[in-house]
Every structure is written in structure tokens, then in C-alpha cells.
């Protein structure tokens, strides 16, 4: 029996077009069209490799002979200081994005994310 090579901690970001308009309009979270930076308000972080995106991640995994990956997707969506409705809508979208990654390639990805507890009741 051959052994699986598993990446136990990785990230996948959505394509800029997959991010809801309200999030960019309210400066909650967005990715520049050239996919070089992710942003929240005045904060920005460089996207240092194309392999942070779905199709490119599959190419990267093939290059390094990785069979499966555990993904912490959208780890930058913290919801700090957000209104309740914005946090709820963003987390709902985040959940749907994670489900789409899992649904598209369940043989390659196990997806998860951190839920922010500010508005849990």
C-alpha cells in the first residue's frame, strides 16, 4: 500500500470575482483584480504565490506530489469591529466558499475555517 502525502495546513483564496460586492463596497474584504494583495479596510497583505488560488493550488500539489490538503480558507476574514449583519453575511459567504472548495475536489481538499465568536448567542 502506498503512503499518501498530505499537506496538513494550507490556504485557498477566492478569485476576486467570487467575493460579494458588498464586502468590497464596505471595505470588509477584497482581493485586487491582479491578485497581488488581499485587503480589509486600510490593512493589506501581499499574496505571495499564485498557488493560493484553487486551480493553481492543484498544479502546485501535483508539482510536489501532494495527494490531499487540509485547507484553512479565508483565514483573514476576522470580522473585527464589523456590524452584526455584515459579520453574519460574510461568514455565510465564507461557509459557502469552503463548501464549494470541498465540493469541487473532495478527493484533494478538506476545508475548514475559524468562526469568529463576537456575535454567537
Protein language model regions, located:
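Helix-coil boundary/capping segments in enzymes
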Residues: 1-121
